[in-house]
């Protein structure tokens, strides 16, 4: 892995998000950010944070939208609950 990716991950975790031990962190990952996500996960582990990684892609979203035949929930409670219980969202 490029050392610059590790450095960027450290900046995100330490400076941008100011992650501390015990923080609950949601890391939203896309297909082009794999290396950065791995580096951020390592940084979070070093700091003793709790990680939940989510994955999204255009292909995944399209598959769901094409298959879904009903109305969408305008305010999905499960998403709100996740965010309310999260200390840091990256």
Regions found by a protein language model. Name each.
Residues 1-90:
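Active-site bordering "gate/hinge" segments
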């Amino acid at each position: 892995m490029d050392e610059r990716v590790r450095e960027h991950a450290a900046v995100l975790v330490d400076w941008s998000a100011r992650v501390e031990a015990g923080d609950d962190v949601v890391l939203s990952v896309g297909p082009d950010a794999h290396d950065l996500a791995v580096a951020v996960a390592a940084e979070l582990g070093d700091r003793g944070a709790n990680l939940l990684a989510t994955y999204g892609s255009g292909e995944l979203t399209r598959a769901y939208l094409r298959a879904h035949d009903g109305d969408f929930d305008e305010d999905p409670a499960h998403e709100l609950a996740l965010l309310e219980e999260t200390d840091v969202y990256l």
